[in-house]
Amino acid sequence: MAELLRSLQDSQLVARFQRRCGLFPAPDEGPRENGADPTERAARVPGVEHLPAANGKGGEAPANGLRRAAAPEAYVQKYVVKNYFYYYLFQFSAALGQEVFYITFLPFTHWNIDPYLSRRLIIIWVLVMYIGQVAKDVLKWPRPSSPPVVKLEKRLIAEYGMPSTHAMAATAIAFTLLISTMDRYQYPFVLGLVMAVVFSTLVCLSRLYTGMHTVLDVLGGVLITALLIVLTYPAWTFIDCLDSASPLFPVCVIVVPFFLCYNYPVSDYYSPTRADTTTILAAGAGVTIGFWINHFFQLVSKPAESLPVIQNIPPLTTYMLVLGLTKFAVGIVLILLVRQLVQNLSLQVLYSWFKVVTRNKEARRRLEIEVPYKFVTYTSVGICATTFVPMLHRFLGLP
């Protein structure tokens, strides 16, 4: 078993998969500098966050929440694509596990398809992502080495590898959607199962193709997610009743996630993991509070039927498509405005409170600034998406 795990964690296995898909490292350009090994003359990669030199006067202390250590430097390796079908397929698949997908798919589901489904998806997604992000910084398993692996995503190089949160999120979204809709809508179950498997498989394979994870990282992420879905499934009906909880419920929804973010595992160097985790937990808290506000203040014009209720999937017409895109565009514009406004205000307040120079971008990485401003910003975004955007839709006459 130990030998099998070591083989699944081998970077050469990832490199062989990349070569099979037509992704190769570019030939060396000219002689090495002073005979140095490529790893010895590694360059700083754009997007790799490094520990700021100081936090405070005199530069004597590391940034709060960080140990003094240099971030890992990655060998900047050019690559050659010999099969553009796989290149574009896996680049698109990788995007299905990134922020751009979640900020489009989840709001679109809430505004145009079914708010109950979106709530289930978001809560399971938040749970899975938090556990995955924390596991990375607790286990501290490295990503595949480069060379031999070609790495296509530079922003995440500073993060650890095990488990793959892209694989976890894709598996959670796909199969939570399948399990929730099979008791609510009439459609061929086999078709839904195939779509869920294809979606999650493409995202998982994209993590190998982009060189960001080993096979063990991906399999570990899928297995952890499967276990979490099994363990949490009995509580899914309870999730549907959260909007009718007591008036103290929003306090718990704010305090618990903020506490988890503020006490996130200390990293050896700065990486975007803590900021991303804060964003995810804050968005989940905002969405949950938004549902509670809608129920408590009776802001929903007509209550939707709770799960499970068997319904026919309505046919897709031009009118429905235009209406859905219009509602989505209106909602995204409002969300972006709220995000920018709250972010600027929260940063100004925190900078003033901690007496930090406004132009000091490094200050955003400090624990006492990064966590509060991220949390306030994305909690506001979650509340806006579930409460104010639907109100704006009704005001504009968008059913």
UniProtKB/Swiss-Prot annotation:
Catalytic residues (UniProt): 166, 213
Membrane topology for this entry? Multi-pass membrane protein
- Transmembrane stretches, start-end: 88-108, 121-141, 160-180, 185-205, 219-239, 247-267, 280-300, 318-338, 371-391
What GO terms in the biological process aspect are recorded for it? phospholipid dephosphorylation; regulation of type B pancreatic cell proliferation; sphingolipid catabolic process; sphingosine metabolic process
Outline the inducing conditions.
Answer: Strongly induced by TNF, also induced by bacterial lipopolycaccharides (LPS) in neutrophils, endothelial cells, and other cell types. Not induced by growth-related factors.
Q: Keyword Manganese: yes or no? A: no
The record's region (Phosphatase sequence motif II) falls at: 163-166
InterPro entries in the cross-refs: P_Acid_Pase_2/haloperoxi_sf, P_Acid_Pase_2/haloperoxidase
GO MF term list: dihydrosphingosine-1-phosphate phosphatase activity; sphingosine-1-phosphate phosphatase activity
Q: What class of enzyme is it?
A: hydrolase
Gene3D superfamilies named among the record's database cross-references: Phosphatidic acid phosphatase type 2/haloperoxidase
The record's listing under SUPFAM superfamilies reads: Acid phosphatase/Vanadium-dependent haloperoxidase (SSF48317)
- Give the protein's biological function: Has specific phosphohydrolase activity towards sphingoid base 1-phosphates. Has high phosphohydrolase activity against dihydrosphingosine-1-phosphate and sphingosine-1-phosphate (S1P) in vitro. Sphingosine-1-phosphate phosphatase activity is needed for efficient recycling of sphingosine into the sphingolipid synthesis pathway. May play a role in attenuating intracellular sphingosine 1-phosphate (S1P) signaling. May play a role in pro-inflammatory signaling. Plays a role in the regulation of pancreatic islet beta-cell endoplasmic reticulum stress and proliferation.
What name goes with this protein? Answer: Sphingosine-1-phosphate phosphatase 2
Which species is this UniProt entry from?
Homo sapiens (Human)
Q: What lineage, starting at the top, does this entry show?
A: Eukaryota, Metazoa, Chordata, Craniata, Vertebrata
